[in-house]
Regions:
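Conserved short "hinge" loops at termini or chain/domain junctions
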Residues: 1-71, 132-153
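Short loop/turn elements at secondary-structure junctions
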Residues: 4, 81-153
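Elongated alpha-helical scaffolds
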Residues: 73-82
Length: 153
């Protein structure tokens, strides 16, 4: 079994009623040119999870669609929270609780308190680290000047 997985529309449908996913795919679209709202929600939540994993100083998978497998229930809860208002439906208390717990867990990962599983195909560090822009840090002189520092002046 892979340690990092891709969240799909079928995963959301199995977590939530399939009718909810069908309604999102048909009723929540304004036009035929608009993307599937469930796929957009999955894409945005996946990006947030990967960002939180990177913020914690952990490696991510090369495939930008993959997240740690243990975070899939959290991702699906956040996808539902993100997508449900598009149908002008209110979140249930359980859905709110699950989404809040998911955000709390992601915050702990971002601060390094929880370690996610290692990626199957890690992204090289050079790809995930921003360049500094070439700015040099100026440091103050070490210590307090002593009498010997002024000898000969």
């Amino acid at each position: 079994m892979d340690r990092w997985i891709k969240i799909t529309v079928e995963d959301v449908a199995s977590y939530q009623a399939g009718a909810f996913v069908k309604a999102l795919e048909s009723k929540a679209k304004y036009s035929e040119q608009q993307e599937n709202p469930v796929e957009v929600a999955i894409e945005r939540i996946t990006a947030r999870i990967r960002s939180d994993v990177k913020s914690g100083g952990f490696s991510v998978d090369r495939d930008t669609d993959k997240i740690p497998a243990e975070l899939s229930p959290d991702a699906i809860a956040l996808v539902v929270e993100f997508a449900k208002p598009r149908l002008t439906l209110k979140l249930s208390d359980d859905e709110r609780t699950l989404a809040a717990a998911a955000r709390e867990r992601l915050d702990k990962i971002a601060t390094g308190k929880i370690k996610p599983s290692l990626p199957d195909n890690p992204e090289p560090a050079a790809e995930s680290v921003q360049s500094s822009g070439g700015c040099a840090l100026v440091r103050p002189a070490r210590g307090t000047p002593q009498r010997s520092d002024y000898a000969g002046l």
